[in-house]
Amino acid sequence: NSGYSNIHNEMLFDFVVFVFTGPRTRKVKRREKKADEKRPRTAFSASQLQRLKQEFQQSNYLTEQRRRSLAKELTLSESQIKIWFQNKRAKIKKASGLKNDLARQLMAQGLYNHSTVPLEADSMDTKLLNGQNTSGDCSRSDYTSDSDGDSLTH
């Protein structure tokens, strides 16, 4: 129903934001936000990144006090600091190839494959990925990517 989707897209949602004001006390701040509104990506300066990396080398995790201090020093919000550290830990975990037990079990059963095809895939690979049969004797399902997603194999 297109009438419903138009109304749905224009609806405003209330979000609850917790503002840290000290140990174990929080104030609730309410604000309205459009459903399709997205926060812009944070562009860290070179000096901010250098300082964040330096702090990360000392410890992968920050105390609340250290996060507050770093946020003030770098003129960033505590959330930006927290998310940067979370993303950095996730990036390292992904690069190390560590997977949880469930993911390993699913991979062993052939039920877990989040491989991607590289951007520089040639035109035949692209046609195959788009479901276009190029030779008449194979289908899209006949091709799989390797574990790193570096190439397609038949």
UniProtKB/Swiss-Prot annotation:
Region (Disordered): 127-154
GO biological process: neuron differentiation
Extent of Polar residues compositional bias: 129-144
Keyword DNA-binding set for record: yes
UniProt cross-references to PROSITE patterns, sorted A to Z: ENGRAILED (PS00033), HOMEOBOX_1 (PS00027), HOMEOBOX_2 (PS50071)
Gene Ontology CC: one annotated term: nucleus
DNA-binding region (UniProt annotation): 37-96
Keywords, in A-Z order: Developmental protein, DNA-binding, Homeobox, Nucleus
Source domain of life: Eukaryota
Subcellular location: Nucleus
Main location: nucleus
Coiled coil stretches, renumbered: none
Biased segments, Acidic residues type: 145-154
Stored InterPro entries: Engrailed_Homeobox_TFs, HD, HD_engrailed, HD_metazoa, Homeobox-engrailed_C-terminal, Homeobox-engrailed_CS, Homeobox_CS, Homeodomain-like_sf
Cross-referenced CDD domains: homeodomain
GO molecular function, one term: DNA-binding transcription factor activity, RNA polymerase II-specific
Pfam family, one: Engrail_1_C_sig
Entry annotated with the keyword DNA-binding: yes
Family: Belongs to the engrailed homeobox family.
Protein name (record): Homeobox protein engrailed
Organism: Tripneustes gratilla
Gene: EN
